[in-house]
């Protein structure tokens, strides 16, 4: 998928191949968690994902919730892994950014807005804000994490964040 290629492209720019693998793996975990939870009856209630039964249909709701939660925590475990060559202060920045991207200012916040906007007339700017949270923040993380690892300057990190968020928004269109 284009998301996987983008994740690998940006992560390959870091100085450590092992760290890029862990970053890519954590993003895949986050993405899978978000899809599993998005399909649940209390969310979008989708029965199919990519033409196959959604996780809650195939394995039950409780297993789907626990699987999604486990993938979410696994993403953080992967980045916190001590056996790769990234300085602790950079790991902390990456973990903080990942938490932001999946929490109330990111995926979870975007999903909340999505659910609250159902069957309502909502302005275009609110829809854009929701989409930037739901996908833009994770793409932002994909672009920013390698910049953090490589020790990029503040302007470069800000630019990478902006580019990632915009790519994520375009992904929604």
Residue ranges of predicted features:
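Mg2+-dependent prenyl diphosphate-binding active-site environment of isoprenoid biosynthetic enzymes
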Residues: 15-173
């Amino acid at each position: 998928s284009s998301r996987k290629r983008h994740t690998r492209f940006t992560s390959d720019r870091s100085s450590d191949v092992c760290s890029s693998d862990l970053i890519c793996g954590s993003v895949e975990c986050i993405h899978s968690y978000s899809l599993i939870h998005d399909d649940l009856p209390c969310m979008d209630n989708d029965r199919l994902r990519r033409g196959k039964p959604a996780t809650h249909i195939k394995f039950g709701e409780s297993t789907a919730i626990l699987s999604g939660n486990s993938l979410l925590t696994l993403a953080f475990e992967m980045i916190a892994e001590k056996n790769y060559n990234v300085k602790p202060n950079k790991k902390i920045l990456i973990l903080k950014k990942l938490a932001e991207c999946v929490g109330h200012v990111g995926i979870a916040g975007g999903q909340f807005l999505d659910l609250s906007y159902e069957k309502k007339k909502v302005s275009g700017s609110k829809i854009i804000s929701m989409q930037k949270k739901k996908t833009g923040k994770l793409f932002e993380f994909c672009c920013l994490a390698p910049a953090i690892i490589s020790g990029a300057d503040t302007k470069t990190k800000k630019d990478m964040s902006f580019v990632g968020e915009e790519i994520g928004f375009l992904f929604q269109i």
